[in-house]
Structure formats: C-alpha cells, structure tokens
Design a protein with these regions (language model features):
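Acidic, Mg2+-coordinating active-site environments of NTP-dependent enzymes
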Residues: 1-134, 158, 183-186, 190-192, ...
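Active-site beta-alpha connecting loops in nucleotide-dependent enzymes
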Residues: 120-122, 138, 142-201
C-alpha cells in the first residue's frame, strides 16, 4: 500500500502466500526463489561453511523489470560467492539481484556488489580473536533466524560452544517456539550449550 505506483514489487516466490500475488498497481511482481524457478532463481548452491556460500543466480529475461534504466545485460546468469556464512544468505543475494536489476545494473555489477557484502555487529557477524571464533547473531532473533545461526555454527570446525538467549515478541506460542528451536538444536553436534533467560532454560 505504501509503494510508489511507478515502483517495483520484489517478492519471495518460495513463500506460499506471496506467490499468489499476480499484480500490484497493474504490474507483475518480480519473484525470486530456489524451489520456484519462475523469475530470478538460484541453483548449484555450495555451502562453504564459515567462508560463505557459492551459487548460480539466473536472471530470467521474461521476469526482467521494465524501467528507464533497464540494460540489455540484466538477464544474464552468473556464479557468485556470497562472503557471509549460511545457505539462507542465498535468498538475500537473490533479493539484492532483483533490486539491482530494477535499478538497471549489469549482471557483473550485481555480482561485484554481492561479493563485496560485509556484515555488521550482531547480524551473522564473525569475530576472530586470540584463537577463538565468535558467531555474533544475537540481534532480535526469531525461530527461523535462530535455526539458521545454529546451522552456521554446526559447519564450524573445532569445539563448539552455543550460547542462546530468549526470543521476544513471539506471542502466545512463545514457549512452543522455544521448544522447537531446542529440539532442532538437539540434532546438531554442539560440545557445550548455555541458555540465558526464562524461556530458554
């Protein structure tokens, strides 16, 4: 509702609810996804552990955004190495690619932008100091992001110490959602688990 009528709608095509949206302000949305290969999609996904993720992003020509800035090269495919750990980062890369395409960037420019991405504190941020590696991802966690962080930590080598706190603003299902994260974590190979907070203990 807040979008400029001349703007571009970019949606996750793997979301069952969003994929049903066929038109916004008379325009077809730009979809990206892994399971649903309509529009912009990624395949050949290779998890590189804490070094990031490599994948191939396909910029489908029939899903190209028609703007004054649109370039002839926007529909190219390219292989990119995302320098942030976690396979979930592929979705962020595809969303960024869709935005870049809408702004008229070439595939090479989009690739360069993704490969130059840097994390910020408390957002999937890796700190290396005194022989220790810390995965700092503690800002405003939710069940999906918590499981993604656990997956990233699970790929690390050496002794793994997992420190988790409560997740807030989850509503009436907060206890069940904490239990689900705990059950998910139990399937991973952690050496030490420390929990902080009334809902996490």
């Amino acid at each position: 509702k807040s979008m400029n009528p001349d703007g571009t709608v970019i949606l996750n095509g793997d979301d069952d609810k969003l994929i049903t949206i066929s038109e916004v302000y008379g325009k077809k949305p730009v979809f990206f996804g892994i399971k649903n290969t309509a529009g912009i999609y990624a395949d050949h996904i290779e998890n590189l552990g804490l070094e990031g993720v490599r994948c191939r992003i396909h910029m489908a020509a029939d899903n190209a955004v028609q703007t004054e800035n649109q370039t002839e090269n926007a529909a190219e495919d390219f292989t990119v190495q995302i320098p942030v750990a976690g396979e979930h980062m592929v979705y962020n890369a595809m969303a960024a690619a869709a935005v870049g395409e809408a702004l008229g960037l070439t595939a090479e420019q989009i690739k360069t932008g993704i490969e130059g991405m840097e994390t910020i504190a408390r957002r999937n941020h890796i700190i290396r100091e005194n022989g220790f590696l810390i995965l700092d991802d503690c800002y405003n966690a939710n069940p999906v992001s918590m499981k993604a962080s656990v997956d990233v930590l699970d790929t690390a080598k050496g002794r793994k110490v997992c420190i988790l706190g409560d997740m807030f603003e989850l509503g009436e299902n907060e206890k069940q959602l904490h239990y689900e994260v705990g059950s998910y974590l139990a399937q991973k190979q952690m050496d030490v688990l420390l929990t902080v907070g009334a809902l996490s203990t």
